[in-house]
Design a protein with these regions (language model features):
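Extracellular, repeat-based ectodomains that mediate carbohydrate processing or recognition
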Residues: 1-161
Length: 161
């Protein structure tokens, strides 16, 4: 109806921050389906969470959680259909920092985790982007090389997810 609704808590993870968050949420909507992703460090544990809504954001399902020692966040989301989406995030391992992605569904399941590409973990690398176009899933991010930065892109077949 063109009017703002009252804010809704997606998940009460009780994360308290004392400053400006760099790691904001992402949302994608198609019809009444919403997919939201966010970083949290509640109770000192860094993780990213994703949640679906099938009623235009009135309610949300239980979060799908990605945990690990090196979760940085900088989440991104895309919908494949009303029940499935793609979740992306940054994660640091012993081998470096990577843009990761996986298929998720509204039933709480996560598919294979894909290592999309190496990234710089600093703020200069910005926030990765994700788009589903036709039968391809495109990813883009800033590659930081000293004083020179460039945008990197890669795509995977939608069927891979």
């Amino acid at each position: 109806d063109g009017n703002w609704t009252e804010p809704t808590i997606i998940h009460a993870d009780n994360w308290e921050i004392s400053g400006c968050p760099v790691n904001g949420p992402r949302v994608v909507a198609e019809g009444n389906t919403l997919l939201v992703g966010w970083f949290t460090a509640a109770k000192g544990a860094a993780k990213v969470q994703y949640s679906f809504s099938s009623d235009a954001g009135a309610t949300f399902g239980a979060p799908i959680t990605v945990e690990g020692q090196g979760i940085i966040g900088r989440v991104e989301v895309a919908l494949l259909d009303e029940q499935t989406g793609i979740a992306a995030w940054m994660e640091t391992t012993k081998q470096g920092t990577f843009l990761m992605a996986a298929r998720i569904d509204s039933g709480g399941k996560m598919g294979k985790r894909w290592e999309i590409g190496a990234m710089d973990s600093g703020r200069k690398s910005g926030f990765p982007q994700l788009e589903v176009l036709g039968d391809r899933v495109y990813f883009a991010w800033t590659e930081v090389n000293g004083e020179t930065n460039q945008v990197r892109t890669v795509f995977l077949p939608k069927a891979a997810f």
